[in-house]
């Protein structure tokens, strides 16, 4: 209940981590993760709206509004990670042994969108030679590639999936994360 009373993502996320083990069942965990995901989406949506307005402003040669790029990308990551946890718990059986997902359907479009932004986040950090963040964002994108939740987005990802996987494999290799480098190289070779 403390998680659901938190007003911001960081506080709610902290409370969730502290109280996860004491939550009664998977449904309670799913509800908490859904709430934390929605807090991350609130930040993401606010920054996304500014970015969308900026695209239009560029076309009309109007003033561009600055937005918090780092918060935008971090909130996309946070929403994706916590949303996937919500979906995991949402798919578990209740006390009667029945699986009745309550949050997955509503979260899927938002999570598909935030996951796609992980590619842009990786590009942003690649331009700044920030290896850790490239691996964080592109790695999360690739690590969730086989998640059935994102099956409908597969067609749209085909145009850049192999390239993202190739460069992520290079970054992972440079970081001496050979298991990840091999995994990402395998994804790239399927392209």
Residue spans of the language-model regions?
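Start-of-domain marker
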Residues: 1-51
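Short helix-adjacent coil turns
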Residues: 6-11, 129-130, 176
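Conserved structural position within tetratricopeptide repeats
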Residues: 20-21, 88, 143, 186-190
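Residue-level recognition of tetratricopeptide repeat
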Residues: 22-31, 148, 161, 178, ...
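Short coil/linker segments at helix-helix boundaries
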Residues: 39-132, 136, 140-163, 167, ...
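Extended alpha-solenoid helical-repeat scaffolds
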Residues: 163-191
